Amino acid sequence: MPDTAPQLRLYNTLTRTKEAFAPIDAKNVRMYVCGPTVYDFAHIGNARPVIVFDVLFRLLRHVYGAQHVTYARNITDVDDKINARAARDYPDLPFNEAIRKVTESTNAQFQADVTALGNLQPTVQPRATEHMDEMRAMIDRLVQRGVAYVAQDHVLFSPSAMDARKGPRYGALARRSLDEMLAGARVDVASYKRDEMDFVLWKPSKKGEPGWPSPAGIETLGRPGWHIECSAMSMAKLLEPFGGGLKCDDPERNQFDIHGGGIDLVFPHHENEIAQSCCALGTERMANIWMHNGFLQVEGQKMSKSLGNFITIRDVLNDGLPQLGEWGDNTVRDRWAGLAARLSMLQTHYREPINWTAQRLAESADELHRWYGLLRDEGFGAPEKLSHASAVAAALCDDLNSWAAITALRQAFKVRDVAALGEGMALMGLLDPYFVTASDVPIFARADVDASAIAARIAERLNFINAKNWAEADRIRDELLQEGVQLKDSKDSATGERITTWDVVG
C-alpha cells in the first residue's frame, strides 16, 4: 500500500456501519460480484453494479497494486429464463444447441456493452456450467453436515437446521428472523419441502432440459439452484487458488474480502449464499464486507416494459445521445456514449437510488467534452502512474464517494490542473486515451476555426445575457451558426453557472 494512500472505508451491509477496510491478505485482496444471467440484453440497471464495482476494483488496484487484487464476476448460464428464451428464439434447433446460441450471443453482447461503459475486465469471469463439480461437492458436504436433505430427487437446504447448529444465524444479512422472512416471502411451498423456508440446491431436469450427474446419490440428471452457483464459483476462484476450499480446515482461508451486488440481492440470494458457504466451509463469514448498490429509476419512475421506459445498455450506446450523429467507426462512438453514461451514473452515490434521465446524460456528455478538450489542448498523455490523483483517491476511499470525486475533477478543470484532471479521470475509468490523442474524433473537429475568436464571442454573448440584452445575445448566436459554429448552453450541476460549449456543424 502506498504510504500516502488514505484509509479505505466501506459501508458493510452485514454490520450496517462504515468500516475501515483491512484485507485478509494485503497481497491477495479478493472481491466477488454477482454477474449477469445471459438470456437477454442487459439494461441500464444491470450497468450500475458493473460500474460501481469496477471503480472499487480500480481503487483496490491503486491502493494495493494491480497484481495483488483478484476480482471475480460470474456468468450465470444455467437458468429457467435461458431455457425459455432458447425455446422461443430457436424452436427448430436441438434444445442444448439453442441454449448455447442464447448464452454465447447474449454474453458476447454483455461484454461489448460493459466494455463500452469504460469497465476493466474482471480478473476472472467463471461460468456456472464450468463449475458443476464444485457445486456437487459442496452440496454433498451440506448433506453430510445435516443442513441439507434429499427429497424427490431434489436437494434442499434447511435454514432451521442451520440455526440449530453453532455458527452464523440465517437472516443476519437481511436482519430478519425466519418468521419475519416467511411472512414477507413468496416461497414455493412444494410438498417435498420439510419447511416452507427451505430452498433448492439441486433439482431434477425435465425431459429435454440440460442436465448433469446429480449429487447426494440421486440417479437422475439434474441442474443446480441459483444460489449454490455463486457459492461454488467464489470458492473455486477466490478460495481454492489461495489454499482454501472444502479440503481446508482453516476458517481464515475459507473467506474472502468483499462480496458485492445490487440491493435486491440481499434476500434471498446473498442470504442463501452465506448459509451455504458458511455451513459447507465451517466459517462464521463468507465475506468480510458486503456491499450493495441502490435501485435505478428512469425519469422518476420504476423501469418496466409495461411503462415503455425499459432501456438497455445498447439503447443508451446507440440512441442515448442522438446529437452525436453517425461516426465512421460506431464502436468508437459507443465508447464516447458509454463514458457519458458512466459519468452520469457516478454523480449519484452508489448506495443511493439513482434517477436516470436523458438530460443528465446529455449534460454529462457536455462536461466530458470540456474535460477532454482541455486534455487535448494541453497534450496530456496516458499516465503510467496516478501520482496526481490524490484528491479523487481520497474521495473514493470514503465509501466510494463518487460525487466528491467528481467535484475534485471539476476543481482540477477549473484551475486547469491537467495532471490532476487526467489522472483522476483514469482512476474513475473516465479516461479513454483515444479521445485525447486521436485527430479524427468527430466531436473534436475544429477545421479552419479560430477557437480564441469563438471564445471571445461567447464571452461577449454572456455579457449581453447577464445584462438581459437578449437581442444582441441571439444575434451573436445566429451569426456563429451561419459561420458553421453551433453554441450549446447548459448549467454546471454543482454551481448552477451557465456553461456554453460549441461544435462545428455542416
From Swiss-Prot:
Does ATP-binding count among this protein's keywords?
yes
Q: Tell me a GO cellular component.
A: cytosol
Q: Which cofactor does it need?
A: Zn(2+)
Q: Which Gene3D superfamilies match?
A: Cysteine-tRNA ligase, C-terminal anti-codon recognition domain, HUPs
Could you say which residues bind ATP here?
305
Q: Which UniProt keywords apply?
A: Aminoacyl-tRNA synthetase, ATP-binding, Cytoplasm, Ligase, Metal-binding, Nucleotide-binding, Protein biosynthesis, Zinc
* A single MF term (Gene Ontology): zinc ion binding
Q: Where in the cell is it found?
A: Cytoplasm
Q: Which GO terms describe its biological process?
A: cysteinyl-tRNA aminoacylation
Q: Name one Pfam family in it.
A: tRNA-synt_1e
For this chain the motif 'HIGH' region maps to: 36-46
**EC number of the protein:** 6.1.1.16
Q: What domain of life is recorded for the organism?
A: Bacteria
* Entry annotated with the keyword Aminoacyl-tRNA synthetase: yes
Q: Where is the short sequence motif 'KMSKS' region located?
A: 302-306
Q: How is the cofactor bound?
A: Binds 1 zinc ion per subunit.
Can you state which reaction this protein catalyses? tRNA(Cys) + L-cysteine + ATP = L-cysteinyl-tRNA(Cys) + AMP + diphosphate
Question: What quaternary structure, including any partners, is listed in this protein's UniProt entry?
Answer: Monomer.
Concerning NCBIfam families, the annotation shows: cysS
Q: Which PANTHER family match?
A: CYSTEINE--TRNA LIGASE, CYTOPLASMIC, CYSTEINYL-TRNA SYNTHETASE
Q: Which family does it belong to?
A: Belongs to the class-I aminoacyl-tRNA synthetase family.
Q: What is this protein called?
A: Cysteine--tRNA ligase
Say which species the protein is native to.
Brucella ovis (strain ATCC 25840 / 63/290 / NCTC 10512)
Q: Which gene encodes it?
A: cysS
